[in-house]
């Protein structure tokens, strides 16, 4: 499948996914170089899968910072593959930081903002929204899927100052 292709193409050794996605792709370990499959969530996991929450438990203050060359590879974003297999676009740490900073500046984001979104974080736009929330200190209300009624309730409940979405989300 697509995850297997991307994991093999980029040489991934670890895949981190939501519980549901991790369950649906657990065969990727047998078909690629992936050694670990890590899942978010509280649900029980099958043997051979690691819990993200368990990995962090008790270690919240033990992360060491590392020096990173801003021009080194940060992310490989994959195209949709409309003309064949998906193609990886290599982005440096500088690329990501500047994109996040410029988007925050253009959208006038600040730590006083609350953004509601259902954009998937692995998608480029979703990643920029998530990273922008981290950079500016704004509150991020992230929904696992787009449902117009749920989103509208969330905007009201959280007194959102921003909604981030793709054009089809604004047509409801």
Which stretches of residues belong to each language-model region?
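Residue-level signal for inorganic ion chemistry
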Residues: 6, 15, 37, 137, ...
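Conserved pre-ATP/AMP-binding loop-to-beta segment of ANL
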Residues: 39, 57-78, 85, 108-114
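Conserved AMP-binding A3 loop
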Residues: 74-98
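Adenylate-forming
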Residues: 15-26, 119, 144-149, 160-172
């Amino acid at each position: 499948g697509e995850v297997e292709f991307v994991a093999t193409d980029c040489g991934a050794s670890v895949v981190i996914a939501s519980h549901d996605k991790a369950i649906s792709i657990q065969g990727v370990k047998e078909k690629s170089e992936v050694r670990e499959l890590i899942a978010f969530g509280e649900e029980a996991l099958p043997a051979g899968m690691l819990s993200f929450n368990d990995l962090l438990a008790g270690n919240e203050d033990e992360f060491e910072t590392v020096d990173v060359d801003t021009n080194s590879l940060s992310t490989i974003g994959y195209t949709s593959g409309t003309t064949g297999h998906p193609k990886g676009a290599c982005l440096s740490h500088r690329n990501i930081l500047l994109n996040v900073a410029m988007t925050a500046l253009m959208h006038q984001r600040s730590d006083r903002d609350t953004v509601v979104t259902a954009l998937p974080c692995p998608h480029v736009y979703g990643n920029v929204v998530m990273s922008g929330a981290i950079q500016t200190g704004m509150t991020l209300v992230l929904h696992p899927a787009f449902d117009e009624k749920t989103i509208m309730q969330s905007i009201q409940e959280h007194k959102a100052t921003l909604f981030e979405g793709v054009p089809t989300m604004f047509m409801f």
